[in-house]
Amino acid sequence: QLRTLCADLQTLIRSETGHDAFIMIDQEGGAVTRLPESCINVPGSMALAATGDPETTYLAGKLTGEELRSLGVNFNLAPSVDVNCNPANPIIGVRSYGDTPATVAKYAAGMIRGLQDGGVLCLAKHFPGHGDTSLDSHLTLPCVDKPRDELERMELAPFRAAIADGVPAIMTAHILFPALDDSGVPATMSRRIVTGLLRGEMSFTGLVTSDCMEMQAVQKFFGSVNGVLAAMNAGVDLVLLSHTTLLSGEAAKAAAEALQSGKLDRKEMEESVDRILAAKAKLAAVPAAALMRSRPPP
């Protein structure tokens, strides 16, 4: 059923745009598993790291990538490279590979490589880091109020490693980082963080995606549509609205109007389109038929 749905979606999108669609999923493994039990599901990040063998993480990533691609899903919004450094964190916990940047970087590298070898795009999240919060950005707007040198040592280190390991995309966090941007907007909506830090200082040239703009960190404090426009102005390529079709339409209309009026920079939007099309070309180069496995029904 899922395979048929994804195939139908691709046919529709190709007929309308001439390009393949990104079909995304949150399939981290463990606590964040979206596929049914009849599919291949792997343990979560902390459990994989507990094996002490990064090759296990690679194999889990490759299995996950192959399973997703065989079903028609081509972009996995994983792994989390957040460092689990706050015991009071309500949302990361076992989704993290560990409580040190080195551990997270070591095991995330295998997952990033495995997912891509399995035939899907992946990303590192939640930039600049969701590990040291005591609040959940699904419900409210957290703040990580620590100096830049501490952010460099703890939060940013796994992202720098993921970039060096060739991660094709990075997802931003709806979190305030006053040491990086004191203007009162979360990372997703911050040009200083997305364009200045991630693109500039860290030299990341891949795709930047937002976390879902319907999360309360954005919706409650800024409004989802305003948040979408701010994220695009900040340098985010793919702005995610994961739940409400009507809201997606409103945001698309607002973005088109902002582009027409000059509130969105046309050159920057064209550069985003180029990055998106380059990523889709990379996916198209992977022969999906070679990844199809024949497994007996459950």
Question: Which sequence ranges carry the predicted segments?
Answer:
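Short, conserved phosphate-binding/catalytic loop or strand-edge motifs used
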Residues: V81-I91
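A charged helix-plus-loop insertion that forms the helical arch/lid used to bind
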Residues: C39-G52, S96-G98
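Second-shell residues forming the walls of enzyme active-site clefts
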Residues: Q1-T17, A31-T33, D99-E268
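Active-site-adjacent structural elements in enzyme catalytic domains
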Residues: L2-R14, G18-A21, G52-S70
